[in-house]
Structure formats: structure tokens, C-alpha cells
Amino acid sequence: MNKQPRAFTSAILELFSEEITTRSGTLIDTIQDDTRLFARSVMPGVREVQPGDKLQGGVALRATESEVWLHPYVFRQVCRNGAIMAHALRSQHLTDLDLQDFWDFESVLREAIQACCADEVFATSVREFRSATEVQADLALNLLSLLSRSGLQNTSGLLGQIMDQFFREPAQTRFGLTNAVTAVARDTRDPDTRWRLEELGGAIAASIKPTPPSLNPGMKKARRQFVSIA
């Protein structure tokens, strides 16, 4: 049973790093405080979303003293933006970990990391990104509504930053909007806001609309659902 949150998230990070490096991957970003851990990694394989525009697949991890979220991750090399594909079938949300000993769920955590690293998972993400390059972004979808659904604070300020970035993009496609959102995420200092923006970027690329996360910390399972925004 977990009694020390930072020791717990440190153990999670060590296991995550081990699984990633075993697969010749690299941890590219880690943020840890007394109660939270955010980590992102990339695998060595590269695919092009457009000529000369390369993507790498990987895994994004978020952990608290009682929960772990694992999602496929897409990293765009040219601008060093990342998108979290929280809608992916291989995403995992492990709960009630503070009521268990670490070794009781270690194998489940390793399997979840391995699943997110699978080649077919990255291939699916690349198809979603390529499709996004061919679809004009309909701003009537109401980006402010999407931001609100993502559970983000200061949505009006974020909206202004995203729109400024979007109109600098060479094409006003769904891919361009994804890049605008993830560019703002990249430059955001708050790790939770950055995570949620990267989730939103992944959702836009895949043409889905996230519902807000549950505000009830006692919920046993994530209540996130997705509907098409195509």
C-alpha cells in the first residue's frame, strides 16, 4: 500500500524508463513534484505526415499517488510539438493503486506501456494526422467549447494564443489547428494545462471531441468519452 506519493511516482518513472529504453526509446520530457508525475517518450521509428514532415510515436504517462494514465504519443520533429492520443484503444487508466502493493500491478503497468509502443498504434496515429492535413478546420466548431470540454482553465486566454498561432500556419486545416494547439502546449509552463492541451491536439487530429474529465476525485474510472467532430 502506497504511503509516500513521491516515492510511488519515482518507482513508476523508473519502471517507465526501463520499458522505454528496453525498446530503444528515449524519455524526452519528465516533470515530477511531490504528488504528480508527467513523462513523455519517443520510439526510434519515423514516418512522414507530409513530405519532409516527420513524426515519431511514443508513450505519454501521467501519475498521481493513486492513478496512472498511459496514452500513445505523437511527436512532430520539425516543431518539437507533441500530441497525446487519449482516445486510442490502447490507452490505459489504472486506478486505486494506493490500495495495492507496487508489485501487485507492476506487470499490468508494463503491459500497458508495451501496448502503447506497438507499431500498429503509431500507424493508426499517422493515418489520423495525414487525414487531418486534407480537411479544412471549421472554426465554427467553436474552439472555445472544445477548450471548455477539456477541463482547462483560462480558456479565453488560451483561445487567443491558439488562434494567433493557427493563422500563422501555412494551411488552415485540422492538422494546422492541431499544430497550433500543441505549439501553445509546448510553451505552457503548467504541466496539467500542457497535458490537457496535448490531449486536445490529439483529439482534433483524430476528429473527435472530448467530454470534460470528472470533477469527482472519488470516481473509480475515467469518465472521458469521445464523439466525432468531422
Positions of PLM-derived features:
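Amphipathic alpha-helical segments
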Residues: 2-26
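Residues at beta-strand starts and edge strands
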Residues: 12, 35-37, 55
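Beta-rich nucleic-acid/ligand-interaction surfaces
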Residues: 26-47
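Intrinsically disordered, low-complexity regions enriched in serine/threonine
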Residues: 46-230
